[in-house]
Amino acid sequence: RLLENGDIDCLWCDYSPCYREDKYYWTEPYLTVTVSVAAKKTSGIKSLAHLDGSKTIAVIAGSVSERRLLAGDLEISPDVQIKSYGSAELCKAAHAKGYVDCWMADVQPLDRLVARYPGLYRVFADNVMTVDLGVAFDDGYEGPIVKDLNTALFAMDRDGTIDRIVGNYKTGATTGGQGANP
């Protein structure tokens, strides 16, 4: 609503065009993040194939992970229960408390979970998907900002700025050579 009302100019925080292509006017993708799943080592869950109707998986509400699971786009039993939470912290808490069997998210918080509790959790060896991130503007936007932002993002990709930022904050994220094209 804030975007539609003009209270803000854009949405730019781990935001993906996936399943939203026609809802917003997008910049070119500037970053690709890897999505995987974490499970307790004692669970026996090592891949999506190990999930059956008795298992539950935590996802962030509104995320690409949630949308793909609900759409049946991933090779997973349709009987797996999907529990949607409002944040990564809530997913992590639900997983730690045993309310869910595993947690699907960007690898960054999953890797932090494994590092914080060595020997307790594992992240699937096979990544589930990659997700392109972009900046979303109101669908009716016609100004020069998107073109200027694409140009700036392309330059930041080309000169290594995005990779340096990613290196500081997001294990498992890369530009994948996708930096916005001018």
Which residues does each PLM region occupy?
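Solvent-exposed, polar/charged alpha-helical surfaces in well-ordered, non-transmembrane soluble domains
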Residues: R1, N5, A49, R67-A71, ...
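A ligand-binding cleft/hinge motif common to bilobed small-molecule-binding domains
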Residues: E4, W12-K23, R68-A71, A96-T130
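Bilobed "Venus flytrap"/periplasmic-binding protein-like clamshell domains
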Residues: Y15, V33-L90, V107-P109
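Periplasmic-binding protein-like
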Residues: R20, L31-A39, V107, D111-F154, ...
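Short active-site oxyanion
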Residues: S54-T56, V100-D101, A152
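Solvent-exposed, acidic/flexible segments
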Residues: A58-S63, S84-A88, W103, D138, ...
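Ligand-binding clefts/hinges and TM-proximal coupling segments of bilobed small-molecule sensing domains
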Residues: V64-Y85, P118, R122-F124, L153-P182
